[in-house]
Every structure is written in C-alpha cells, then in structure tokens.
Amino acid sequence: MKKRKIVSLVLATVLGASMVLGGCGSNGGSDATNTEGTNTEGTNTEGASGKSSGKITIFQQKTEIYDQLKELAVDYEKETGVEVEVWQISGDDYYQNLKTYMSSESGPTVFSLSSSTEIAEMSAYLEDLSDLSFLDKINDDLIAKSDDKTVGVPMTAEGFGLVYNKNLISEDQINTTDALVQTIKDAAADGETGLGLSQEAFFLIGQILNTPFALQDDPAQFCQDVYDGKVNIADVEEFQELGKIFEAIKENQKNPLEVSYDDNCGDFATGKTEMIHQGNWCYSLFSSYDVDFDMGIAPLPIAGNKSIAVGVPSVWCVNTDASDSDKQLGKDFLNWLYTSETGADYLTNKFGFIPVVDGMEADNLDPLSQAVSDAIAEGNIIPWTFNEEWPAGIITTYLVQNAEEYFSSDMTTDEFLKALNDSFVTAVNE
C-alpha cells in the first residue's frame, strides 16, 4: 500500500504548547433519526442537489455527545435564528450509513469522518473549508486536507496509553518493559489484574500495537518495508518488548477475550485492576462509579518510550453537494462553534473535548484529558499510525483474529508476532 500523498490527517510531534479526540465512543449508526425521533432517511433531499433546505442537518459518529449536541442545536437557533437538526445514531455502522445518504443525494449538511482512508473515499463530497475564520489558530497538522484543500476541522485531540491508579502503583513501577511485566506478575500474586485489555478489536490489539510502529524513525517507510517483506516485526526490538507484555498478560491474568470494555473500565474504577490500556475517552464511564483515587496516563514503556499516542479521532466536514446557501449555513455553524463563547463552552465543558484552537481554554478537564493536554504541551506524544499507514480494515479483519488465536490457544509469542506481520502483508495486497 503506497501512502496517499493527497490526504493529510497527521498529528505530528510539532504540536505546540497552545494545542491541547470516542476512539473511542465513536460508534457508528445504522439508523438515522431527527431530534424528534422520526426517520430522516430521504427527508433531506431538498438540501442536496442544489436546493436550499434553510436549515442545518448534522450527522456524526460520537454517540457520547449526541444529547449535548441536541442542546447545542437549541441554543444555536436561539442565537442565530437558524434551525439545526441532529440526526441520531445507533448501532455500529455510521460510515456505511453516511455513504448511503451521500450517494442517494440525501446527505447531511455537516458530518464527521475519522481517518485519512474515509477522507480519500469521500473526497468528492467534501467542501473546501479554507475560508473558515479560525483555521489560522489550529495547528496545520491537525487539519484534514485533500488535493491541497482544507476539508476537515478537528473536533478534538485524544490520547491513549497506560491508564493507571496512582493509589495502587507509581509511574516508576511501569516505566520500563521489565518493570511493567513485573508489576503485572505482582498484581496477579495479590489477586488483582495488573494491565487490563478487553475483547473489542481496537482495545485488544489495535491501539496497543500502534506504539511499536509509531516509535520507528520513519513509521511510513517502516510500514512499507514490512509490506515489501524487507522487515519482519518479529525481529524488531519494539515489537519483541510488546510481545513480553502480551505474554505476561496471557500467563497471569483472566483471558481478555472474556472481558468487555465496560467490565474492564469498571474493574479499574473499583480498584480490581491497576491499569488498563485505554484513552482519555474512558473517563466518562467512571461517572457511574464512586471513584475516589487519582489516575493518570503513562506511556507504554517499550524500548524506553516516554510518550503517549495522540491523534485526531474525528473531523467536521461540510457536504459540497448541498446548495450554496446550505453550504454557507454549514460553514457559519462551524465558525460559530469554534469562535463564539457558547460554542467554546460546548466544546470544552459540555462535550468534554480537549481544545484544538489556540487561545481556547478548558477549565474543567477530567484527569485523563488533562494528562493528554499536558503531554501535548510538553511534546511527549507519538502519532496514530493506524489512521495513516495501516491498510484499511486490518484491525477488525485480521489483527483481532491473530490476537484471539493467541489468547485462546498455545500459540507462542514469536508465532503471534509473525502472524501479525503476515496479516499486514496480506491486507496490503488485497
């Protein structure tokens, strides 16, 4: 797979201190309904094909902000007089549903995309957003581009690593691979889980496998070398150290294939698990628990790594097939969202987003989002290579099967790493 040169959605380590996401509450939607609960499929055709609808329709995949987005719609109409209809999502196929709407000329005015692959596939539907008033206050590496046009505005930044309970362990107990492995073993001896993974594809293998790729001097070239058979990840130090961590989990803990995301986060919130490999988005689940301990996000310490993985989970886009007046309404909405006092309050406080606009401050970030913000400000970040360099669909189609086989059989760690390598070679040639 050759890297797509026309698409840029890279969070590089050049993020400045002024820059502060899901992941992963980003479930898709097989159903789309308006704010009144009626089905909107086919109801927005007057907003496509060049005819004005006179209102803004929004469709996006972050389910955790749906209710707040409906509240925002009410406030936006009060301030501007423009109606906003928020389409509901449920299920796990938001992107396919979006493509169906677009191809049938019933697409929303404003929508979200979550990877360079999606941006490339949907490029024909993406309006040029270069004239938005606030773009010069966002780091250029956060902005989605296609054919040198600005086509996507970042919602937020998100980061993942070792989410750990500061009351149970200190960061110096997990700052090297050997120390982390020993901590996992010690926790097992005490009847606790040291490092929790869960059965979902991204949380079982996708995100944790990002780190050894991101630590390479040139991740894009490294991936290409893997695809070309010049490198086998089983022979590379960073992957071998990750293998040691997987082996410690396999030998000392409950099988992660038997653990759901909710259970994994719940066990951490109740002190049964010392660490989970997760991101700042998981903090929202802790509101259901009486969490009374300090927590933070530490780097996955393979090969001396001191950085957490930070990236852009989703970007806002405007439908170029909408009428000229509706496209302007969509742009006006984004300008308001990122420059008005009300919009900033929703982004930082009600959505809980880490701000990406220079000068936009968040006074009430939760501890995990604050840890991500601090890492960005300090420059201690590595990119999300799975969004840019990996073959589309490899995590859910291939890598999760490798991990499931590893945790459910007598497959050795070396065999596991070689199987992962083979999956990359196979997926890129499909």
What residues fall within each predicted segment?
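Glycine-centered hinge/linker elements that transmit conformational signals in sensory
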Residues: 227-258
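Conserved N-terminal structural module of periplasmic/extracytoplasmic solute-binding proteins
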Residues: 9, 24-118, 304, 325, ...
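A structural signal for short loop-to-beta-strand junctions that line the ligand-binding cleft
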Residues: 101, 108-109, 133-167, 193-197, ...
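Extracytoplasmic/periplasmic substrate-recognition and gating elements
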Residues: 57, 74, 79, 288-350
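Hinge/lid segment of periplasmic solute-binding proteins
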Residues: 114-161, 172, 179-182, 189-190, ...
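Extracytoplasmic/periplasmic solute-binding protein
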Residues: 151-155, 160, 181-231, 273
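Extracytoplasmic "Venus flytrap"/periplasmic binding protein-like
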Residues: 75-138, 151, 166-175, 274-275, ...
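C-terminal capping/gating helix-and-loop segments adjacent to ligand/active sites or protein-protein/ligand interfaces
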Residues: 145, 349-356, 371-429
